[in-house]
Amino acid sequence: MANIKSQEKRVLTNEKSRLANKAFKSEIKTAIKKALNAKSNDDANKAELVNHAVSLVDKGLKKGIFKDNKAAREKSRLMSA
């Protein structure tokens, strides 16, 4: 454990951020899986699911959860075929 007061605060803040990022990543993974399943099964609402997943990936990039290349790769995978 940290000895400095500001570092003790940072430990708590980092833990909150870690949990929030973990939840957001899980939400994105679920959206991507749903979109890819909809594309392979040729569902009627596949465009809506793909748009939602791409939107979440963009938000993750904006928040700094994803790096540029990963976001581009995921978006490309969602948009292809």
UniProtKB/Swiss-Prot annotation:
Q: Superkingdom of the source?
A: Bacteria
Q: Which Pfam families match?
A: Ribosomal_S20p
Gene3D superfamilies (alphabetical)? Ribosomal protein S20
Keyword set includes Ribosomal protein = yes
HAMAP family, per this entry? Answer: Ribosomal_bS20
Query: Per the similarity annotation, which family is this?
Result: Belongs to the bacterial ribosomal protein bS20 family.
What is the protein named? Small ribosomal subunit protein bS20
Protein's organism: Mycoplasma mycoides subsp. mycoides SC (strain CCUG 32753 / NCTC 10114 / PG1)
